[in-house]
Amino acid sequence: YTRDKDSEGIYSAKLNLKTGKLTKPVLAAKGDNPSFLTILPNEKFLLAVEETNDYEGEPSGSVVSYSINASDGSLIVSDRISTKGGAPCHISSDQAGRHVFFANYVGGSVGGVSVDEKGKLKLSSFIQHTGSSILPRQKSPHAHSIDIDPSGKHVVCADLGLDKVVIYDFDSEAGKLTVNEPGFAKVKPGNGPRHFAFSPDGKYGYTNNEITSSVTAFEFDSTLGALKEVQ
């Protein structure tokens, strides 16, 4: 996404809250194909995935933490860590800002990373998906997004290759992800779920399906961590 001849990494712009106008973007930090970003709740750190398949000689991408200069929007690298899988395409944070989660598209895997008060990173979880679905582009898992539910107890991943929304239990103290039981919700074969969003009250969840340009709606039981399709 960002490896063309003109792009050098992550850019920032200032927003005028009265007029809605943005200033011309300026380089905030150089990076290797950064594709998705999240800012921690304390607004001190920005986390990015670098969507590569060649991190330090491994078929992997990386998670990078940056400290934010609030005065000019510039970023300084605090730490970098391998995602243990290729082409990480999404990253999100828990409510406390102590942990982030990543999804590897090519690797078909997900993981969790702990973030300390200095922005240092430590891999806390890694889970490899297995399986396939019906279309040629679904011959293997393709984890496309990963998000925590409003209760902070569960994390879900939309996997385009499996036609599933995979569900994990989350231990916020240890930063550990474990596969939940029942473990996943299916969408119609060939739909290809890409991203997932919870309603603010946590009672519903929605996935947009990339291949069929559709949306699937679910009821969410936050006690069990279970999704039930309703539309």
Q: Each PLM stretch: what is its role?
A:
Residues 9-11, 62-64, 109-111, 164-166, ...:
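A short loop-to-beta-strand structural motif that recurs across blades of beta-propeller domains
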Residues 2-5, 51-57, 106-109, 162-164, ...:
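Short glycine/acidic-enriched loop and turn motifs that connect beta-strands
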Residues 14-20, 66-73, 112-122, 168-177, ...:
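Short loop/turn segments immediately following beta-strands, especially the blade-tip
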Residues 74-145:
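Asp-box/WD-like beta-propeller blade repeats and closely related beta-sheet repeat scaffolds
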Residues 23-29, 76-81, 125, 131-136, ...:
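A short beta-strand motif characteristic of beta-propeller blades
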Residues 31-42, 84-95, 131-152, 187-204:
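Beta-rich, blade/repeat-based domains predominating
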